[in-house]
A protein has these predicted regions:
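Active-site flanking residues adjacent to catalytic metal/cofactor-binding acidic residues
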Residues: 43, 497-498, 546, 605
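A short, compositionally biased domain-edge/stem linker segment
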Residues: 1-11, 476-485
């Protein structure tokens, strides 16, 4: 008598191991991009896993029962996903109500969008790019869950139809899924534009209008449900064609070696992808550019590599996959991967406050342990009790106690009353605060807005006709530098060119005698345009101060072009950059520090080293200046050029 074969994949420890690989990659990437620049691709692995598992469940149910119960499927998904997410949203709202009240107004739309499974489209619509580094965005990571939740809503409907009208033609449906994934890859490649997708300091290239708002092309491609569904379709195709648990048990032999090879090929493909697709976008002096290969088949390639890893993980003869991915550590992480994904990003954000700030190894270990503790609490006391129906049992027992007239002890009544009070008061406070909060700028944005206004006023005052007065000699590095007058307008004796860092000290620099030209998101190349113009109208004076490189990675050629224009300027002072963005900081500072050896009139002020010693002068993004830091920064520059 033959043994009945299971109709559905049972528990697969190695598949949990695949989840673990994906979530660890994402967590490391979110902690510090320089550690694993392609770690964001872990999300694509999750998409393939979801497409595979959900389609497998739906096909198995159809074969077992002759139909698919849409209601039961959606209830199971809701019990699996919603409780932990609701706890997260409530927890973030309560934390911000107590400690980050200025951010509540900005958070309100994010929470509403997350509740209705539309966070990715909300993020596209409001134009808060996924790639901004200086925003407080504790829920930004929910975009990928929104993509999956939309899939969970629509996919059962499609599978219900497919299993009804084409039950005997599932292979054809599987081929259709593959063709659809290829079509998505082609559409993404055709929609993507190579080169600069946004000029530094300007609005990203608009792709289309969505409900009256401009949509940036790169946000649409990276965050959109349609363009990111390719992995889901590949996973669904795998579920149609690959159900090894239906096969008769066979010896490992050569078949095991074959699937070990498939596993290694897939794992190698993911490793190569993480190395090649180093980020989604990069900002250089040309502008913000995307990684062409990523949008021209890169996501599809990652999906194929994920298919290979998953196919091996669920096959009983793939011993290598089971050993590497099915051990206790990997399965522990994999079973909690949903909670880890949910909680790690808010923990990181509530600590560092700004998305682009990299964590140190010490901070990373502590914050991951905190996220893991929250995940474990959620797993034990929220996710599993809801999934197993324990909350319903508890509630029925409480009702039975009341119906039977059971007398509780005073201590028990007090304990329950205290828990009830906390469970009601804090959430109510958070919800009321959230509903009534105003949308505000964060501290950095507010400071920069005030500085921009000050710069406009200062430039208007400086551009007014005045009598040209020759300055007194000043001593710099042992030499004498004397400013001279021009016939074409007022000489700019000390010209300071910078980005948002210098913008934070614009008023202080002006009060100390400098003419300031600073703006947010400025690239190093834009300094060339400024000095070329001022030289053409003969307004360049004795000293030019340049502090750029926070927003873009520059090149030696750009600095050389600037110095060709400034070769006759007696003193050019460059400041190194201090920004939590690697390798940009290292590359730019290496180029800046090399300038004095090439140009005798160049001096370097090592702002990176100084700022590292005085973190109290910087906002929590470790880049922009607090008011006291603005004064300190201006004094440093004046000391460096001999004016203080």
């Amino acid at each position: 008598m033959s043994e009945k074969r299971p109709s559905l994949l049972g528990y697969s420890p190695a598949l949990d191991g695949v989840r673990a690989l994906a979530v660890v990659a994402v967590i490391v990437y979110h902690a510090n991009k320089s550690w694993l620049r392609g770690g964001f691709l872990g999300v694509e692995v999750f998409f393939v896993i979801s497409g595979f598992l959900i389609t497998s469940l739906l096909i198995a149910e159809s074969e077992r029962n002759g139909t698919i119960s849409l209601k039961q499927f959606w209830l199971r998904r809701a019990r699996r996903l919603l409780p932990a997410m609701w706890v997260l949203l409530l927890g973030v709202a309560m934390y911000c109500s107590l400690f980050e009240r200025n951010m509540l107004g900005n958070l309100r739309g994010d929470i509403i969008a997350a509740l209705f499974y539309g966070f990715n489209w909300f993020q596209i619509w409001v134009g808060t790019s996924y790639f901004t580094a200086f925003d407080f965005v504790p829920l930004r990571h929910l975009w990928s869950l929104a993509v999956e939740e939309q899939f969970y809503l629509l996919w059962p409907l499609l599978m219900f139809v497919f299993t009804r009208v084409a039950r005997r033609r599932l292979p054809v449906i599987g081929l259709l899924f593959i063709v659809t994934s290829i079509a998505i890859a082609i559409f993404t490649a055709a929609t993507y534009r190579s080169g600069a997708i946004a000029t530094v300091g300007e609005t990203p290239e608009q792709y289309m209008a969505f409900l009256g708002h401009p949509v940036a092309r790169i946000d649409f491609l990276f965050l959109g449900t349609v363009t990111r569904a390719g992995g889901l379709f590949l996973g669904a195709a795998l579920a149609v064609f690959w159900r090894p648990w239906l096969l008769q048990t066979s010896p490992i032999g050569t078949r095991g070696q074959l699937f070990d090879g498939v596993f290694l090929a897939g794992l190698g493909g993911l490793a190569v992808s993480a190395a090649v697709f180093r980020d989604v976008v990069d900002t250089t002096d040309v502008g913000t550019t995307g990684y062409d290969l990523l949008f021209r088949g890169g996501f599809f390639f990652v999906g194929l590599a994920s298919v290979a890893v998953i196919a091996a993980a669920v096959h009983p003869t793939a011993t290598m996959a089971h050993r590497l991915l099915g051990n206790r550590v990997m399965t522990y992480i994999g079973r909690r991967s949903y909670g880890l994904y949910l909680y790690h990003w808010p923990v990181f954000q509530l600590y560092r406050r700004f998305a682009g700030q990299g964590l140190t190894p010490y901070e990373f270990v502590l914050l991951v342990l905190l996220a893991l503790a929250l995940t474990e609490l959620s797993f034990r006391y929220v996710e599993m009790p809801v999934r197993d129906g324990r909350f319903g049992t508890w509630w029925r027992n409480r009702r039975a106690e009341r119906g039977a007239g059971v007398q509780l002890s005073v201590a028990t009544r007090r304990r329950r009353a205290g828990v009830l009070a906390v469970s009601v008061v804090l959430p109510a406070f958070a919800l009321i605060s959230l509903a009534t909060a105003e949308v505000k700028l964060n501290d950095i944005s507010q400071s920069l807005a005030e500085s921009e206004s000050a710069v406009v006023d200062l430039l208007e005052a400086q551009s007014a006709p005045t009598t040209v007065v020759q300055t007194a000699p000043i001593i710099v590095g042992g030499g004498t530098v004397t400013a001279t007058t021009t016939l074409d307008g007022q000489l700019i004796d000390v010209l300071a060119i910078g980005d948002s860092v210098m913008l934070g000290s614009a008023r202080e620099l002006s009060e100390r005698g400098a003419t300031v030209d600073a703006m947010k998101n400025r690239s190093t190349r834009q300094a060339l345009e400024i000095v070329n113009y001022l030289k053409s109208v003969r307004r360049l004076g004795s000293i030019v101060v340049i502090h750029l490189g926070t927003n873009s990675t520059t090149t030696e050629a750009v600095f050389d072009e600037i110095m060709v224009t400034l070769r006759d300027t007696p003193l050019v002072l460059f400041l190194t950059v201090h920004v939590p963005s690697e390798p940009r900081q290292t590359i730019n500072n290496r180029l800046i520090n090399a300038l004095p050896a090439k140009y005798a009139n160049v001096k370097v002020l090592d702002w990176h080293a100084i700022a590292s010693q005085y973190p109290e002068y910087l906002y929590s993004d470790t880049t922009h200046l607090r008011p006291a830091g603005a004064r300190f920064y201006a004094d440093l520059i004046m000391q460096a050029i001999g004016r203080l």
